[in-house]
């Protein structure tokens, strides 16, 4: 058991040890313990925002309970480009899905942050509001009040935008300037400038429009450069570093505890409508269990995996699923259903002639990059892994080709339009200026890029189910990749478009590509092949063999108007339960058309106002 660097180290200071039945609410409440108005369960991207905003009111006491570790002193989290070093470390939940037929029975690794700040402490630091139409789609699902015009003030409230001279076409007036989540667009790293400009121009040359700022009312559809969550000193902005600052952590009405695993919400059984009374947690699998009450509300912010797990362990979930584990049903709700993730057919590696960051993977180059970051807060280590991205629609003319139409995939597989609106994208292409080395290799002997595509609006839905009644046992995650034919077609189309951009000048002149390659065993094959002659069947086979998660799951406890198809209402209150809300990516009614971290922050900002009664 530990704590953040300013608060709790002993659970006995804020909770009571359980000696009897945890189902006896009156017995638990009879024990004297510190009282909290609000308990936020989960100190991830949303939880840190909620704890900070709710504790602004000195009249209320707030407890933030995080299952993972403190973020204090985690160097690889502070350095923006060092995030791969956190994958499969103790700061990662290191989830693994079940095997899926769509990817040849393989499982998929799901990284999720296991420290304060959650996945915002281990992700790629891209700042993206996604498409304005995403929020219109939320309203259509019954999430009244969540349209973009209502969300925009909360994006701006969170933003602390810092203009940069490398990006003169960005209008700072469209962004917030004093928010905790510092955002910037620059600088463009000097060594990757030429190849970055080549990618932009080649994307334009195949018909994709240029977008200077992905985060405006116009939306992201087009090619451009990502904004980044990075402080001016070159360090990562996470929900923890942005919202749980030393001054916030010093508030006498805020308690932050880490390494406390939420096991279940205690619900009253003597009222007509069940009410959340408190939280049961433990500090180790076989260790002491503790109880802490909440006088006003509990807010579940345990993430797309943790939130449905805690709900089901508390008796809130599909009745049939709860019955499998002999859990009494408090509310029969579709918890764990409607799970969606951004699927990727796998990395598409490209050999280059020059102009990449591969030098930082070598000992001397890495040392020089570290020195530049440590003393000046500059250089590749202060930058994003992904420099350029294209957001496109599958029905865009870019996909047309006189010799081999991009819609050939739709001849075999019917494409379903899952876009949020007429201008919202359903495919993302990305380019990172270095070659990601395979397992067991430190670096490649030549320069290159790592590229890939994301299926932004999948037609496939998955589930989160319990593995057991023990909160320490990871739940069963099944994103159901490529279970819908449309997802297969879009994956084929996206891979083909990416390969076409790579063979379009001026980008092609920077690359070392063969005329064509039929060596499907090569990790370079998807971009080595000729996009005009490679078959749909071959691209599909590659996607099934190499497909993986991009770490953007949502909607496992989604918001909506009906208890038959959603878990929480438009105020994030769990249907049929008093005093319990959900606030994290699990409450998204539908998947968003981009990187979700900024959306989670904005949702939490609005949720705080809903709880305060001012939204």
Curated annotation (Swiss-Prot):
Induction, as annotated: Induced in strobilurin-producing conditions (on CGC medium after 6 days of growth).
Biotechnology and industry use: The structure of strobilurin A was used for the development of the major class of beta-methoxyacrylate agricultural fungicides since its beta-methoxyacrylate toxophore targets the Qo site of complex III of the mitochondrial electron transport chain and prevents adenosine triphosphate synthesis. Compounds such as azoxystrobin (Syngenta) and Kresoxim methyl (BASF) are among the most widely used fungicides worldwide. This class of antifungals are used as effective treatments against a broad range of destructive fungal plant pathogens and make significant contributions to food security.
EC number(s) per entry: 1.1.-.-
Function: Dehydrogenase; part of the gene cluster that mediates the biosynthesis of strobilurin A, an antifungal polyketide that contains a key beta-methoxyacrylate toxophore that targets the complex III of the mitochondrial electron transport chain. Strobilurin biosynthesis begins with construction of benzoyl CoA by step-wise elimination of ammonia from phenylalanine by the phenylalanine ammonia-lyase str11, oxygenation by str8 and retro-Claisen reaction to form benzoic acid, which is activated to its CoA thiolester benzoyl CoA by the dedicated CoA ligase str10.
Protein name: Dehydrogenase str4
Keywords, ordered alphabetically: FAD, Flavoprotein, Oxidoreductase
Family: Belongs to the GMC oxidoreductase family.
Binding residues annotated for FAD, in chain numbering: 45-46, 66-67, 123-126, 585, 596-597
Any matching Pfam family: GMC_oxred_N
Active site: 552 (proton acceptor)
Matches recorded under InterPro entries: FAD/NAD-bd_sf, GMC_OxRdtase, GMC_OxRdtase_N, GMC_OxRtase_C
Cofactor: FAD
Residues in coiled coil: none
Known pathway: Mycotoxin biosynthesis
Quaternary state and interactors: Homodimer.
Gene field: str4
Listed GO MF terms: flavin adenine dinucleotide binding; oxidoreductase activity, acting on CH-OH group of donors
